Amino acid sequence: MRVLLIIAGLALLSVVCYTSEMKEQNSLNEVLSAFFDVEEPQEKGCIICF
């Protein structure tokens, strides 16, 4: 019984860590996406100029 609780606790801990890591990665992707969205119109303008 005790072993089962330990395994369940470890599984829950791994799920929580994985979820927080995914949220962190998503926020990083949003920042990078916003940065490249700001930069993109300038690139399009330069391509049109040529």
Curated annotation (Swiss-Prot):
Subcellular location: Secreted
Tissue specificity comment: Expressed by the venom gland.
GO MF term list: toxin activity
Keywords: Secreted, Signal, Toxin
Lineage: superkingdom: Eukaryota
GO CC annotation terms, alphabetical: extracellular region
Signal sequence bounds: 1-19
Coiled coil: none
Record bears the keyword Transit peptide: no
Homology family: Belongs to the neurotoxin 10 (Hwtx-1) family. 67 (Jztx-67) subfamily.
Protein name as catalogued: U37-theraphotoxin-Cg1a
Natural source organism: Chilobrachys guangxiensis (Chinese earth tiger tarantula)
